[in-house]
């Protein structure tokens, strides 16, 4: 009976399998995206599907909700994006683009999956009316203050002119 002395021994194969077993969990962990990475990927998808002329970039990310540990479960997200100066046709990352002055702001909500292999998201974005409403409230308050001030000035002028008119004694 002949033994194989020159071939790989059982000990070497065991060592190789052990190392593979240690490396595989690291590869699986590397495939799970962080909450912010998943949102940035979703924004890339939004930019690809958008018919707008310029790219959008993350302006504000709402706090991460409490989540379970399963990367395959859809996670709720909400964030705000703003139009940049970079055209959609550019090869630049949106993060390398400056925000456009008076650029369009959109509020986005939906879900993302943190498993990088699935790379799935369901996001819808609409014009952020909260900012427009705040601006409208500002102008309404200015109008009220100016209007109230003008009424007071008008009343003082009326009182002053009323005192100038000579009074007749009867």
Swiss-Prot record:
Question: Can you quote a single GO CC term?
Answer: vesicle
Q: Which GO terms describe its molecular function?
A: lipopolysaccharide binding
Give me the disulphide-bonded residues. Answer: 86-97, 108-125
Would the keyword Disulfide bond turn up in this protein's UniProt record? yes
- Range of residues in the leader sequence: 1-30
Span list, region Active core? 150-162
Keyword Secreted among UniProt keywords? yes
Give the record's keywords alphabetically: Antibiotic, Antimicrobial, Cleavage on pair of basic residues, Disulfide bond, Immunity, Innate immunity, Secreted, Signal
Q: Which domain of life is it from?
A: Eukaryota
Q: Which GO terms describe its biological process?
A: antimicrobial humoral immune response mediated by antimicrobial peptide; defense response to Gram-negative bacterium; defense response to Gram-positive bacterium; innate immune response; neutrophil activation
Q: Where in the cell is it found?
A: Secreted; Vesicle
Q: Where is the major localization of this protein? A: secreted
Task: Offer one Pfam family short name for this entry.
Answer: CAP18_C
Propeptide part(s) removed at maturation, as residue ranges:
31-131
Modification note: Proteolytically cleaved by proteinase PRTN3 into antibacterial peptide LL-37. Proteolytically cleaved by cathepsin CTSG and neutrophil elastase ELANE. After secretion onto the skin surface, the CAMP gene product is processed by a serine protease-dependent mechanism into multiple novel antimicrobial peptides distinct from and shorter than cathelicidin LL-37. These peptides show enhanced antimicrobial action, acquiring the ability to kill skin pathogens such as S.aureus, E.coli and C.albicans. These peptides have lost the ability to stimulate CXCL8/IL8 release from keratinocytes. The peptides act synergistically, killing bacteria at lower concentrations when present together, and maintain activity at increased salt condition.
Q: Give the family, as the similarity comment puts it.
A: Belongs to the cathelicidin family.
Q: What is known of its domains?
A: The cathelin-like domain (CLD), which is the propeptide part, does not seem to exhibit auto-inhibitory function, as it does not inhibit the antibacterial activity of antibacterial peptide LL-37.
This chain's function reads: Antimicrobial protein that is an integral component of the innate immune system. Binds to bacterial lipopolysaccharides (LPS). Acts via neutrophil N-formyl peptide receptors to enhance the release of CXCL2. Postsecretory processing generates multiple cathelicidin antimicrobial peptides with various lengths which act as a topical antimicrobial defense in sweat on skin. The unprocessed precursor form, cathelicidin antimicrobial peptide, inhibits the growth of Gram-negative E.coli and E.aerogenes with efficiencies comparable to that of the mature peptide LL-37 (in vitro).
Q: What is this protein called?
A: Cathelicidin antimicrobial peptide
- Identify the coding gene: CAMP
């Amino acid at each position: 009976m002949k033994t194989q002395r020159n071939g790989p021994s059982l000990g070497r194969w065991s060592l190789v399998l052990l190392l593979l077993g240690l490396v595989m969990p690291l590869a699986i962990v590397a495939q799970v995206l962080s909450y912010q990475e998943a949102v940035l990927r979703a924004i890339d998808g939004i930019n690809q599907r958008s018919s707008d002329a310029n790219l959008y970039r993350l302006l504000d990310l709402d706090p991460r909700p409490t989540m379970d540990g399963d990367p395959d479960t859809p996670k709720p997200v909400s964030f705000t994006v703003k139009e940049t100066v970079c055209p959609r046709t550019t090869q630049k990352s949106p993060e390398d683009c400056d925000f456009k002055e008076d650029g369009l702001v959109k509020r986005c909500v939906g879900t993302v999956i943190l498993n990088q292999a699935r790379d799935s998201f369901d996001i819808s974005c609409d014009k952020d009316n909260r900012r427009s409403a705040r601006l409208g409230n500002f102008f309404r308050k200015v109008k009220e203050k100016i209007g109230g001030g003008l009424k007071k000035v008008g009343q003082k002028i009326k009182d002053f002119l009323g005192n100038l008119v000579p009074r007749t004694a009867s």
